[in-house]
């Protein structure tokens, strides 16, 4: 069985295990988990869902753009300048205009980033095909647990972080996660532990999409433990 200590150790190292080691570490096999084991793992690791962060009001998000020591210093300088020379407010006004322009730009950038992240999270699929006790099932994606064996087919989004153990000309579009414009051909070979995320061609990550081919893989991370969940 794989306990909490094992899980912490291998969270960032799934790509450097070969297929046999991955099966062994997750205490699973190509026929998949039993329903009893699925229930145990769901109790331990929870549902395969991304938590929605608490939404901050637009006003608070805008005001937070001023939360910087340099901004505090400039605001103080502007106020002092107004108090000392109220008849010459030009410098103070200029400082306030610059601060407001910077805050507005930061607020806009933050909003764009939130929209992009929301769009990325919407790419998680609602159902997926899993093999349990040698039988293929179509199940809700939130029901996946570490150790589940999942089939990936062309046009489907990847439902969790998955270590690929069989690949049939499978290419995955990872642009939403890594920025790589070309689809990545997946393989099953182990990679050095230092391999960067964008170069881990034996992994398929939640929120990416199978562009061609098909594959079989083992769920290694779910929910907030996925690369997408950690963003």
Where in this protein do the model-derived segments appear?
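Conserved cytosolic headpiece of P-type ATPases
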Residues: 2-231
């Amino acid at each position: 069985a794989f306990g909490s200590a094992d899980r912490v150790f291998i969270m960032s190292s799934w790509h450097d295990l070969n297929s046999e080691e991955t099966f062994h570490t997750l205490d699973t096999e190509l026929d998949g988990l039993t329903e009893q084991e699925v229930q145990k793992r769901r109790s331990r690791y929870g549902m395969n869902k991304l938590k929605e962060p608490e939404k901050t009001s637009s006003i608070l998000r805008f005001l937070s753009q001023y939360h910087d020591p340099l901004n505090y210093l400039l605001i103080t300088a502007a106020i002092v300048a107004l108090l000392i020379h109220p008849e010459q407010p030009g410098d103070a006004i200029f400082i306030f205009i610059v601060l407001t322009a910077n805050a507005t730009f930061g607020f806009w950038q933050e909003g764009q980033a939130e929209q992009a992240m929301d769009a990325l999270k919407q790419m998680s699929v609602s159902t997926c095909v899993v093999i349990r006790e040698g039988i293929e099932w179509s199940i809700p994606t939130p029901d996946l647990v570490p150790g589940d064996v999942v089939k990936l087919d062309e046009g489907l989004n990847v439902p969790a972080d998955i270590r690929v153990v069989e690949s049939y000309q499978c290419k995955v579009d990872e642009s939403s996660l890594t920025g790589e414009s070309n689809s990545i051909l997946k393989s099953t070979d182990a990679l050095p532990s230092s391999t960067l995320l964008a170069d881990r061609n034996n992994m398929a990550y939640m929120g990416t999409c199978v562009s061609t081919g098909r594959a079989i893989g083992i769920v290694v991370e779910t929910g907030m433990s996925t690369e997408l969940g950690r963003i």
